[in-house]
UniProtKB/Swiss-Prot annotation:
This is Phylloseptin-J7. The modification Leucine amide is found at L19. The lineage of its organism: Eukaryota, Metazoa, Chordata, Craniata, Vertebrata. GO terms for cellular component: extracellular region. It comes from Phasmahyla jandaia (Jandaia leaf frog). Keywords: Amidation, Amphibian defense peptide, Antimicrobial, Secreted. It is found in: Secreted. It comes from the Eukaryota. Expressed by the skin glands.
Length: 19
């Protein structure tokens, strides 16, 4: 589960960059 956290953060950062 902990390995998913950095992936989720990078995904959120990518989405926020489009906003």
């Amino acid at each position: 589960f902990l390995s998913l956290i950095p992936h989720a953060i990078s995904a959120i950062s990518a989405i926020a960059d489009h906003l």
